């Protein structure tokens, strides 16, 4: 069973609200780097970056971060017969002494964010990392919390939250899937 909990209009308003919150918190946008966790987190990061640039006229740098080899559940994520291929990030941008705005689609156990923080070290030592999450569904296994949340959606562990983006799904929406 599927229920749409965020439609396209709400999706874009959420992107706009998160972007405004980032602008309000950071008077100097020159020290920001936006890092999107591949796959859907990277597309959301791009939308946030575009909105911030549109509102402020800035040119905030960004990268897409592949965390495949930093995950602690790799044996479950890939079929045994297939080895993952490391693609790294879209470009190399130093985050040394910068504030990183780390973006992902769903916050669940916190393990993806832990892996992203490990991967981020390869790009330098950030002065600060702030977390943007489009949907926080609870059920944390690690002590991780978001600085900017699009929507809190309490779920059962058996439910799934699916953030759909134009690049991968042909639309912008969020669905709650239950058995």
UniProtKB/Swiss-Prot annotation:
It comes from the Bacteria. The gene is pyrR. One of its GO terms (molecular function) is uracil phosphoribosyltransferase activity. It holds the Pfam family Pribosyltran. It comes from Actinobacillus succinogenes (strain ATCC 55618 / DSM 22257 / CCUG 43843 / 130Z). GO terms for biological process: regulation of DNA-templated transcription. The keyword Cytoplasm does not apply. It is an enzyme of class 2 (transferase). PANTHER family: BIFUNCTIONAL PROTEIN PYRR (PTHR11608:SF0). Its EC number is 2.4.2.9. This is Bifunctional protein PyrR. It catalyses: UMP + diphosphate = 5-phospho-alpha-D-ribose 1-diphosphate + uracil. Regulates the transcription of the pyrimidine nucleotide (pyr) operon in response to exogenous pyrimidines. InterPro entries: PRibTrfase_dom, PRTase-like, PyrR, PyrR_bifunctional. Belongs to the purine/pyrimidine phosphoribosyltransferase family. PyrR subfamily. A motif (PRPP-binding) lies at residues 100-112. Keywords: Glycosyltransferase, Transcription, Transcription regulation, Transferase.
């Amino acid at each position: 069973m599927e229920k749409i909990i965020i439609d396209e209009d709400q999706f874009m308003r959420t992107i706009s609200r998160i972007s405004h919150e980032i602008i309000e918190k950071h008077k100097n946008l020159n020290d920001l780097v936006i890092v999107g966790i591949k796959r859907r987190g990277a597309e959301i990061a791009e939308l946030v970056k575009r909105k911030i640039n549109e509102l402020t006229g800035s040119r905030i740098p960004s990268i897409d971060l592949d965390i495949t080899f930093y995950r602690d559940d790799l044996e479950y994520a890939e079929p045994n017969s297939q080895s993952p291929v490391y693609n790294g990030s879209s470009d190399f941008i130093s985050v040394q002494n910068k504030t990183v705005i780390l973006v992902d689609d769903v916050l669940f156990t916190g393990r993806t964010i832990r892996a992203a923080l490990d991967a981020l070290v390869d790009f330098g030592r950030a002065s600060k990392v702030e977390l943007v999450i489009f949907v926080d569904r609870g059920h944390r296994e690690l002590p991780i919390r978001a600085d900017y949340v699009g929507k809190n959606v309490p779920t059962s562990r058996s439910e799934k939250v699916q953030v759909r983006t134009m690049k991968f799904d042909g639309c912008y929406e969020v669905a709650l899937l239950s058995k």
